[in-house]
């Protein structure tokens, strides 16, 4: 991008691009420098330039960018993948839920408020209370991608001064090349796009947690209105089927709820870059996304295998 725009020599841009396709930097080789510098980029750039063995071209590597530009842009490329995987899982879960909701739309069962019998509802209606919020989250993804999957290229203090008069065009073209969106500004200390993605993932995990909590109750001994599949065996009580999958989902939901608070605290940056806030984000955001992905994985299997116990539902209504 920079070479084509004349920000750096075109031949150097081509050489750097070609080298990036051929050179594989060993992550272990930059571990020590990452620990010393608090970020991997200085060691990565140094190792890459050494492997290039073309100092006349490698001198233009990382031109006009700062470590945070690299880290944040790479983060958004990973968030894009995470959202795609989540979208696929949500669609699979919704298919399973909609099939059951349609099949058992008229199957009566007791509704419960404060865990006590209330007026009758149906298994289809119960499933709809889980599926509709997931559908809402799914429908938000296109807007979320536009508003949050941003490129970062703003330089050391967020001013883009090192890129000269073509700074805006360089950022725009880089965004297009990577399939990201151009925020048209620096967002080094504005973690709004990160929070949007994390909040969306946390909300999905909470929706799944509500489903898991209800399934724990419905599969409990003495109620037995839903079976969950073949998992959850006990080593000493073979008659039991422990609700392992819904328990895991609820636990993940609880964990994400706490981490979300920490991530919001990490959005408070001092000056133009804040190491404490940045490091806190690194410790919380990956776990929010991974826990959300794990909850989706459990829910995908659970929604495909849970089975209503018709006789018990009917008997519970008297």
Please provide the spans of the model-predicted regions.
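Alpha-helix capping and helix-loop boundary segments enriched in small/acidic/polar residues
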Residues: 70, 110, 114-125, 161-165, ...
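Generic, well-ordered alpha-helical scaffold segments in large soluble proteins
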Residues: 47, 51, 96, 100, ...
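Acidic, glycine-rich loop-and-beta core segments that form the ion-binding/anion-interacting portion
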Residues: 169-257
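A structural signal for small-residue-enriched, beta-sheet-centric alpha/beta enzyme cores
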Residues: 67, 164, 170, 177, ...
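Glycine-rich cofactor/substrate-binding loops
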Residues: 1, 32-38, 223, 237-318
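A glycine-rich, basic-preceded beta-loop-alpha segment at the flavin cofactor/substrate interface
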Residues: 61, 179-187, 226, 261-272
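A helix-coil-helix interface module used to build multimeric assemblies
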Residues: 1-154, 160, 166-171, 244-248
């Amino acid at each position: 991008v920079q070479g084509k725009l004349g920000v750096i020599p075109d031949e150097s841009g081509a050489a750097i691009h070609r080298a990036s396709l051929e050179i594989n930097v060993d992550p272990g080789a930059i571990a020590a420098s990452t620990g010393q510098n608090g970020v991997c980029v200085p060691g990565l750039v140094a190792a890459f330039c050494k492997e290039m063995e073309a100092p006349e071209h490698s001198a233009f590597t990382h031109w006009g960018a700062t470590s945070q530009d690299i880290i944040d842009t790479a983060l958004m490329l990973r968030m894009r993948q995470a959202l795609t995987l989540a979208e696929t899982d949500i669609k699979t879960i919704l298919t399973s839920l909609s099939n059951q909701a349609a099949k058992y739309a008229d199957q009566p069962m007791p509704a419960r408020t404060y865990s006590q019998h209330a007026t009758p509802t149906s298994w289809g209606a119960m499933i709809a209370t889980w599926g509709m919020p997931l559908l809402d989250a799914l429908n938000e993804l296109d807007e979320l991608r536009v508003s949050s999957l941003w490129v970062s290229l703003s330089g050391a203090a967020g001013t883009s001064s090192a890129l000269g008069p073509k700074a805006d065009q360089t950022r725009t073209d880089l965004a297009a090349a990577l399939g990201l969106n151009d925020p048209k500004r620096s967002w080094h200390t504005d973690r709004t796009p990160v929070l949007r993605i994390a909040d969306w993932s946390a909300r999905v995990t909470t929706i799944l947690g509500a489903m898991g909590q209800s399934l724990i109750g419905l599969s409990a001994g003495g109620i037995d209105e839903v079976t969950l599949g073949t998992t959850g065996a006990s080593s000493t009580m073979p008659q039991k089927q422990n609700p392992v999958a819904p328990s895991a989902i609820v636990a993940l939901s609880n964990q994400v709820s706490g981490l979300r608070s920490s991530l919001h605290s990490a959005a408070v940056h001092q000056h133009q870059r804040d190491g404490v806030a940045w490091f806190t984000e690194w410790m919380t955001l990956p776990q929010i996304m991974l826990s959300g992905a794990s909850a989706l994985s459990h829910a995908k299997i659970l929604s495909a295998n849970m089975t209503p116990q018709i006789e018990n539902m009917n008997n519970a209504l008297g």
